[in-house]
Amino acid sequence: MAITASMVKELREKTSAGMMDCKKALEECGGEMDKAVDWLRQKGLSKAAKKAGRATSEGLVGCFVSADGKTAGLAELKCETDFVSRNEKFVELAGKLAEQVATKGALDESAQTAINDIIATLGENMGSGRTAQMNVAGEGFIGSYLHSNGKIAVLVEMTCEKAATAAEATFLECAKNVAMQIAASNPAAVSADKVDPALIAREREVYRQKALEEGKPENIVEKIAEGAVKKFFKEACLLEQPYIRDDKTTVAELLKQTSKAVGDNLGVARFVRFQLGEDAAAEEAAE
């Protein structure tokens, strides 16, 4: 069967593979389009295996929130270069992986198949990274923020007491701003009572020993350490942080103001923040 230019064009549109690869696939498969698609996929899988040892230090964090704000997911999709991370197909796949995490709780085999397909198309090693699912039972809403470069993504569970509040524009804007706060300020916990006690003890001991080394009197060392811990809370606890859009207001005060505006009692239950590469940095620090 003669392979025409229109057949090559059609296969390219379906697979985004190179023109010569498409022509060869059609020749190998007797001009049968579906078989040619599979042939290219198989070739892509072979390429993927060869590329599997290459580092995937670039990529994106995919973010998905359901229309009702009750279910959400984050998913890292890694690649080798920043150029590929900005490719439309790569960005689209990151979003689809996040949606699968939101609806199923984890990535399944179809996710790896999709990744292998895009490896064949774009010619770089890729892989999935961390994932996180968030669900809201009852009233409330999941706010989200995805940084413009796709390297930082946040989910935050906002609480309220009235079902109608979750549809209020003022409440939704507050949820978005709190998520943006988390992205920018990287808090360790929502509030002081949710900070890991071991972290608090470590901070207290660091400042206590520092005060002793500076020759401070023993009777004020504890006060110095406690003062330092309070300062630490203002930096590490979301509710105590200065609001990024008005540093004279804390996030807790923002919630109070918004609560009054919507006639409800608002709060933050939890959050998840992913920054691409931070897991690798943590592993290096632990070595």
Curated annotation (Swiss-Prot):
This protein's UniProt keywords: Cytoplasm, Elongation factor, Protein biosynthesis
GO MF annotations, alphabetized: translation elongation factor activity
Subcellular compartments: Cytoplasm
Keyword field contains Metal-binding: no
Region (Involved in Mg(2+) ion dislocation from EF-Tu) residue spans: 81-84
CDD domains: UBA_EF-Ts (cd14275)
One GO CC annotation: cytoplasm
Main location: cytoplasm
Key word Protein biosynthesis present: yes
Family: Belongs to the EF-Ts family.
UniProt xrefs under HAMAP family: EF_Ts
PANTHER family reported for this sequence: ELONGATION FACTOR TS (PTHR11741), ELONGATION FACTOR TS, MITOCHONDRIAL (PTHR11741:SF0)
Function, as annotated: Associates with the EF-Tu.GDP complex and induces the exchange of GDP to GTP. It remains bound to the aminoacyl-tRNA.EF-Tu.GTP complex up to the GTP hydrolysis stage on the ribosome.
Protein name (database record): Elongation factor Ts
